[in-house]
Amino acid sequence: MHQGKLVFAQVMAHLPLSTFRRCVARHGGERKVKSFSCLDQFYAMAFAQLTFRESLRDIEACLATQGKRLHHLGFRSPVARNTLANANATRPWQIYAELAQHLIAIARPLYANEPIGVELNETVYAFDATTIDLCLSVYPWAPFRSTKAAIKLHTLLDLRGSIPTFIHISDGKTHEVRILDALTPEPGAFYLFDRG
């Protein structure tokens, strides 16, 4: 019988917990929380992402199959679908946005010398957006067309290592040009845009 740490626990061991706790405290994420902490929520959503879960029911069922190993994955108790849904609906999203920016700042220097296929010493960025279709009856706050809802994900990608350095989510009608004002240009860097 294998006695080592589970792979998920090994991956989560790299999470800077002190930074995560600072983000949670800064945005009041643990206010009125009794048992399902922000860290539990993060573990559940990270598990869902890494195991390609597609719904809350899918996450709950997959975690339930782990039984006694759930503790070894980092969870303090079983994750209920309703509890996870409430946490996703009420917890400040800024916690996870700030954590993502911190993790990106750690990852970028690791790929600073990665070749990009073109002999340039300068940083090369690619800026693009993708439209994510949503159901209009479920997301009425994101109208896109008369029968459809959507949001747009604008991303600035550092081509060395393919690491996003800027991510902005807007309504589906926002053109990429309107987001350019939110970018802080880096002197000497090259920026690639499509005509979108």
Regions found by a protein language model. Give the residues of each.
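Conserved, well-structured functional cores that handle cations and Mg-NTP chemistry
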Residues: 1-196
